């Protein structure tokens, strides 16, 4: 079963949100429906980056790696980088 690490960008204030999920489309829909408290006031959101992982553990580790950078510049470089 695949898991995804994703980055959303708010169309309201350009902030980024980083998360992981097993069902990417459903999760994005939940964010845009206001069913996630942190992202609700910043709706709407668009998907700007995603990575597929083979298991939950590796997706969670990657999510943590991205979040611990706490750098908008790093996120924007990641978004612009070619996928392999």
What are these regions (language model features)?
Residues 1-43, 50-53, 57-67, 71-72, ...:
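GIY-YIG nuclease catalytic motif and its immediate N-terminal context
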């Amino acid at each position: 079963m695949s898991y995804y690490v994703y980055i959303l960008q708010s169309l309201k204030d350009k902030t980024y949100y980083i998360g992981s999920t097993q069902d990417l489309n459903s999760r994005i829909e939940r964010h845009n429906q206001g069913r996630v408290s942190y992202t609700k006031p910043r709706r709407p959101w668009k998907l700007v980056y995603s990575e597929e992982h083979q298991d939950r553990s590796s997706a969670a580790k990657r999510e943590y790696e991205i979040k611990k950078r706490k750098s908008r510049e790093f996120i924007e470089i990641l978004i612009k980088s070619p996928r392999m």
